[in-house]
């Protein structure tokens, strides 16, 4: 499943253990 992850000033999608 995909969830929204915030990393510093960047926002990316995390797919399982893959970021």
From Swiss-Prot:
GO terms for cellular component: extracellular region. It is found in: Secreted. The keyword Flavoprotein does not apply. The modification (3R)-3-hydroxyaspartate is found at residue 15. Its main location: secreted. There is a cross-link at residues 1-18, 5-11 (Beta-methyllanthionine (Cys-Thr)). There is a cross-link at residues 6-19 (Lysinoalanine (Ser-Lys)). There is a cross-link at residues 4-14 (Lanthionine (Ser-Cys)). Pfam families: DurB-like. One of its GO terms (biological process) is defense response to bacterium. Keywords: Antibiotic, Antimicrobial, Bacteriocin, Hydroxylation, Lantibiotic, Secreted, Thioether bond. Maturation of lantibiotics involves the enzymatic conversion of Thr, and Ser into dehydrated AA and the formation of thioether bonds with cysteine or the formation of dialkylamine bonds with lysine. This is followed by membrane translocation and cleavage of the modified precursor. One of its GO terms (molecular function) is signaling receptor binding. Is a potent inhibitor of human phospholipase A2. Belongs to the type B lantibiotic family. This is Lantibiotic duramycin. It comes from Streptomyces griseoverticillatus (Streptoverticillium griseoverticillatum).
